[in-house]
From Swiss-Prot:
Purpose of the protein: Catalyzes the transfer of endogenously produced octanoic acid from octanoyl-acyl-carrier-protein onto the lipoyl domains of lipoate-dependent enzymes. Lipoyl-ACP can also act as a substrate although octanoyl-ACP is likely to be the physiological substrate.
Native organism: Bacteroides fragilis (strain YCH46)
NCBIfam families per the UniProt record, alphabetical: lipB (TIGR00214), PRK14345.1 (NF010925)
Binding-site positions, substrate: R80, G81, G82, D83, I84, T85, Y86, H87, A152, I153, G154, G165, L166, A167
Active site: C183
Gene designation per UniProt: lipB
Name of the protein: Octanoyltransferase
CDD domains (alphabetical): LipB
Presence of the UniProt keyword Acyltransferase in the record: yes
UniProt cross-references to PANTHER family, sorted A to Z: OCTANOYLTRANSFERASE
Amino acid sequence: MKTITTDWELIPYSEAWSRQTEWFDALVHAKQNGESYENRIIFCEHPHVYTLGRSGKENNMLLGEEQLKTIGATLYHIDRGGDITYHGPGQLVCYPILNLEEFGLGLKEYVHLLEEAVIRVCASYGVVAGRLEKATGVWLEGDTSRARKICAIGVRSSHYVTMHGLALNVNTDLRYFSYIHPCGFIDKGVTSLQQELGRSIDMAEVKERLGRELLAALLSK
């Protein structure tokens, strides 16, 4: 089956979640019934929002409901793995809705593939990134006291079909991370391509590079 790339641009989180779920359910149904389907790689950005995964702890959100309103943000409890994270303008979010079995992937291998694609995109900008032991996502200087996260990853899988995905900080307002313990960490920082390079980064260019890396990785399986 073919894999298509879609760009939702700036979209409210609730609408993106609803669309994702609809396409995810349709792919699961098609797979179970031997029908044709399309794998999708979705790019978007969200207005200010925090999402708390299934294993997340409420105390990693440091603001109450009224305080969230004052910073123009909302909070959603969602069905992905992982803890709490932030999404907002300037952050590239990618939601692959894929039949992993078509690509010969298990869930652990899939998460590794997402990380590797982001690591390669960072490298294309001269930013050296990698993994942190016993943690998901993509990090800079992960084995030092200056460890900082540039990309969060949290997925849901059912019948080897995926939804949710990754969030890469490109030109993200990093102040919004100060209101949470990102991904449950209290002793790790966050960063962005803009922060590391000292300049604004063209979002369309990052989308193109990440889309190319993801497709290449999937097709190599």
